[in-house]
């Protein structure tokens, strides 16, 4: 499939659905930043930057002016991306996923570099000096080509006459808060009118990409949209330009509940999970990185923005203070030193074989701090309390959950449990982080109250860790009652349960119908029990608190290159 045949909006919709767990209602935060910019930014200087960005040639002084203005805007905003270099290793992502990511980032690097190099025969959009420009003009004139083409079809090539082109990186791109502030302050509009206009444009964006024709029609109802330029988009356009693409990005933030990609927030704790999900959506839809220079397709766009920084708002936040490009700030490590593969202690033993690394313990503490110690907290384990293989804690009011696995000591008992209960396979637990379950239990808040379906095993597990202060409420559902919502939960949340891939044999008691063949997943069971008790499946999206990398040993020996 060529880049011209990309079903762009379908890809966007698929990414919206697949990444809905990471989208947020951001309207209030965007408007708070917009008000801060209106109140404190010198719009005389903004006008000078806008004028400078209309020039065909720009100097070192122009770049300094742009960077200084970007720094002021960044200081005024709460929604920003921070410098965060990401090194992805085998564990949270498989070997194949890491190699796929590395390949796509390299393809994206080549595409971006070709695009910034012009992408048109005979046209260079990079950083020629004034003397080089004059020399080129003379050579082309001598060859009978006049002054040569000044730009690609539909736009003008803007040339920066600067020594260090790396200073241009991350200084462009629009921010909704800045767009709204400029429309309000420079257009002499009420911010509420701007918000209403962008909301109307955003409703169009839920079903199609708004175009200039749509903009013109909406202008009849919302005159402030006349402030949006009718010029086609160009590369390296300033965030201070009121382009249609800037308006579309801003209007996405006005639509709560639309799962807009623009409202994605990336945190270090869930970076691996997000990348894994993006790759899953990509493969399901047949997305790809196109070699053709030009505008990025939806997959290329999200890959670049998310990999640029692992901490912040990749689409709508300020990123002018980030150094480097996406392929520099997110790297893949396929050559980690193999970990020592200790044989498991058979037939029992403590669940805590070794101390968890300090960095991972800190991640656990940060995750637990996000739990509400007074909120309803469901708990479930798979495996016996002396040799658990899975633990889940789930708070239905917020959707926050902790979910981890553990390699068992008693492999024979584990295989029997797999066939008749959880469907976990030993090979999938080989590189799970030892000590993680114990670490979680140790750091749970004092006197916390947990809710469970059957509390005997949970109480035994807590007592093994000296946590007699934690109480466990038993809802005491019958086996049939407990699994009333099973199919509904599996239909909606099966993507949360990726390791229970083994075959489960239905249990059949005399005089009773055969039991379920669905594997017992601790996390999905927590969601299922809550849905059974409340009588409905909540709309609150589950949110992982533990990063995927925390669940696996460092430098797991899964690849040998």
Curated annotation (Swiss-Prot):
Binding positions for Mn(2+) per the UniProt entry: 380, 382, 525
Keyword Hydrolase on entry: yes
Enzyme class, UniProt record, top EC level: hydrolase
Principal subcellular localization: virion
Keyword annotations of the record: Capsid protein, Helical capsid protein, Host cytoplasm, Host-virus interaction, Hydrolase, Inhibition of host IKBKE by virus, Inhibition of host innate immune response by virus, Inhibition of host RLR pathway by virus, Interferon antiviral system evasion, Manganese, Metal-binding, Ribonucleoprotein, RNA-binding, Viral immunoevasion, Viral nucleoprotein, Virion, Zinc
Locations listed in the record: Virion; Host cytoplasm
Entry text on domains: The N-terminal region is important for the cap-binding activity while the C-terminal region contains the 3'-5' exoribonuclease activity. A CCHE zinc binding site is present in the C-terminal region and may thus contribute to the substrate binding and/or the specificity of the exonuclease activity.
Record HAMAP family: ARENA_NCAP (MF_04085)
Protein name: Nucleoprotein
Organism: Allpahuayo mammarenavirus (isolate Rat/Peru/CLHP-2472/1997) (ALLV)
Lineage: Viruses, Riboviria, Orthornavirae, Negarnaviricota, Polyploviricotina
The encoding gene: N
């Amino acid at each position: 499939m060529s880049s011209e045949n990309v079903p762009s909006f379908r890809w966007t919709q698929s990414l919206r659905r697949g990444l809905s767990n990471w989208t947020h209602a951001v309207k209030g935060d965007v408007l708070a930043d917009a008000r801060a910019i209106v109140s404190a930014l010198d719009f005389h200087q903004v006008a000078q930057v806008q004028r400078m960005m209309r020039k065909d040639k720009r100097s070192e002084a122009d770049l300094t002016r742009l960077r200084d203005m970007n720094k002021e805007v960044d200081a005024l905003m709460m929604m920003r991306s921070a410098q965060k270099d990401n090194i992805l290793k085998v564990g949270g992502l498989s070997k194949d996923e890491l190699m796929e990511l590395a390949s796509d980032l390299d393809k994206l690097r080549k595409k971006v570099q070709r695009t910034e190099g012009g992408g048109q025969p005979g046209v260079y959009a990079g950083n020629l000096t004034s003397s080089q420009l004059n020399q080129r003009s003379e050579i082309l004139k001598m060859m009978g080509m006049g002054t040569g083409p000044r730009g690609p079809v539909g736009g003008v090539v803007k040339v920066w006459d600067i020594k260090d082109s790396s200073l241009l990186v991350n200084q462009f791109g629009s921010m909704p808060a800045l767009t709204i502030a400029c429309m309000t302050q420079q257009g002499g509009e009420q911010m509420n009118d701007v918000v209403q206009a962008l909301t109307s444009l955003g409703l169009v964006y839920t079903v199609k990409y708004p175009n200039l024709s749509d903009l013109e029609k909406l202008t009849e109802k919302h005159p402030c949209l006349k402030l949006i330029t009718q010029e086609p988009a160009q590369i390296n356009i300033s965030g201070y330009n009121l382009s249609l693409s800037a308006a579309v990005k801003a209007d996405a933030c006005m639509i709560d509940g639309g799962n807009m990609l623009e409202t994605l927030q990336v945190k270090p704790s869930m970076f691996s999970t997000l990348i894994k999900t993006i790759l899953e959506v990509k493969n399901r839809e047949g997305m790809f990185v196109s070699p053709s220079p030009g505008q990025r397709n939806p997959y290329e766009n999200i890959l670049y923005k998310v990999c640029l920084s692992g901490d912040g708002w990749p689409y709508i936040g300020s990123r002018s203070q980030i150094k480097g490009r996406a392929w520099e700030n997110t790297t893949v490590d396929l050559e980690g030193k193999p970990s020592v593969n200790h044989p498991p202690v058979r037939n029992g033993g403590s669940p805590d074989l070794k101390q968890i690394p300090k960095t991972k313990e800190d991640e656990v503490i940060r995750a637990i701090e996000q739990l509400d110690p007074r909120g309803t907290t469901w708990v479930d384990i798979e495996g016996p309390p002396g040799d658990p293989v899975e633990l889940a804690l789930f708070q239905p009011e917020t959707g926050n959950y902790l979910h981890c696995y553990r390699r068992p000591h008693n492999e024979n008992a584990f295989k029997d449990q797999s066939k008749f209960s959880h469907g976990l396979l030993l090979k999938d637990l080989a590189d799970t982080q030892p000590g993680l379950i114990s670490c979680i239990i140790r750091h749970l808040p004092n006197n916390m109250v947990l809710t469970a379906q059957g509390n005997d095993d949970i109480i035994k597990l807590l007592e093994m860790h000296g946590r007699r202060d934690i109480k466990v409420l038993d809802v005491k559902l019958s086996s049939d009652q407990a699994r009333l919502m099973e199919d509904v939960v599996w239909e909606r949340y099966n993507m949360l349960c990726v390791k229970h891939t083994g075959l489960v044999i239905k249990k059949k008691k005399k005089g009773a119908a055969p039991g379920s063949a669905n594997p017992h997943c601790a996390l999905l069971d927590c969601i299922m029990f809550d849905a059974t008790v409340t009588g409905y499946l909540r709309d609150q999206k589950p949110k992982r608190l533990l990063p995927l990398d925390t669940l696996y040993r460092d430098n797991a020996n899964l690849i040998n290159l």
